[in-house]
Amino acid sequence: MLQLNPTPPAPGRWRTILENDFFPKNRRRDIDGLRGLAIALVVLFHAGWLKGGFIGVDVFVVISGYFMGRSALMQHPFQPVRFVCRRLYRLLPALLCMVALVSAGMLWWVLQSDRADIALNGAYALVYLSNIWASGHVGYFQGQAVAYPFLHTWSLSLEMQFYAIIFIMALLLPLTRHRRLVLSAIFSASAAYCAYAWHTGDSQAYYNILDRLWQFALGTMVWMLPRPKLPRAAADAVYAAAVAVIVGAGLFYPLSYACPSWMTVFPCGAVVLIIMLPDTRVGRWCLVPLSPLGVISYSVYLWHWPGIVVANYLLFFQVHGAMMAGVLALVMVVSLLSYVLVERTGLDYENRAPVAARNRGAALLVAACLGLAAVLAYISHVSRVH
């Protein structure tokens, strides 16, 4: 049976987590730092402090494609059950915990009309279809978005949908050259569709996986591209320029540059350059210091938006300034606890459990998500009827 330890880790385990997760010796910490930069951009955007911070999602998407290329398409032989279990233990426990706690804390006191939408959004989030719910209910950059604590899970739904595509590719296409051809086709078709959506002004393209597949595919194809052999000074210069492009986009991009705008090509291309240039001095100076934030970025992403939404509901006005800083500080504490007690515990169990127990645990996680989704869908239905 799956057992998640509810008690705080022993001091020895805290030490192990700090050493192995936050200061690893066998992982590129600059990529963790890039994830830290991306989550900082997103959080500051949602706090109203950075107008182009939405670009952090695009950065995350490319990085996600890169990691999926490594864990699925570049593994020979591909282990489908282990791949699925790893993803489920990585993602479901923290998501389930967040949706359950936020739902329990909000649904009993919000307005009945809000309760119906919030509960349904939570149900869609648990089955990774939140982007589909959002496209039919609210624009991401509209004012009413702040009323939905699970709206941010649209990007997690896109990610899981891409995982499903990669899973099918890894099963059906055993040869790398075939995978390269399919990824190139996906990249080209998605980029063309994205350009079409931008040209026609599709207001819901931001949530559409068809507009994002080229970004996922771009990150995945990094594994299939030759690594540039640049002199140290040239590599540092290119790396610094790439970091500057991402930071500049976060600082100065207007909302009109959000996906499907072609302007997202620049930060996405910058991510590829950073990934392809390991061990640079600029990376150690600029991104490695952000790596601890990158390690807990999933938990930060899960909790930061509900924290802002709940604060707005409780205070009856949109929080800003020092109040927002306090909310984000609390979010960071909750996120760290979520990482250590939930996210990390799930991965530890997946690593150590016997195969049969691991597979049963994954099935239980899926059943728990489906069960809670059914409860939330029922609450939404009852709230609308009455």
From Swiss-Prot:
GO terms for molecular function: acyltransferase activity, transferring groups other than amino-acyl groups. Its main location: membrane. It is a multi-pass membrane protein. GO terms for biological process: cellulose biosynthetic process. The keyword Acyltransferase applies. PANTHER family: ACETYLTRANSFERASE (PTHR23028), ACYL_TRANSF_3 DOMAIN-CONTAINING PROTEIN (PTHR23028:SF53). The chain crosses the membrane at residues 37-57, 91-111, 118-138, 156-176, 181-201, 237-257, 258-278, 290-310, 322-342, 362-382. Pathway: Glycan metabolism; bacterial cellulose biosynthesis. May acylate a glucose moiety into cellulose fibrils, in cooperation with BcsABII and BcsCII. Keywords: Acyltransferase, Cell inner membrane, Cell membrane, Cellulose biosynthesis, Membrane, Transferase, Transmembrane, Transmembrane helix. This is Putative membrane-bound transacylase BcsY. The gene is bcsY. Belongs to the acyltransferase 3 family. Its EC number is 2.3.-.-. It is found in: Cell inner membrane. One of its GO terms (cellular component) is plasma membrane.
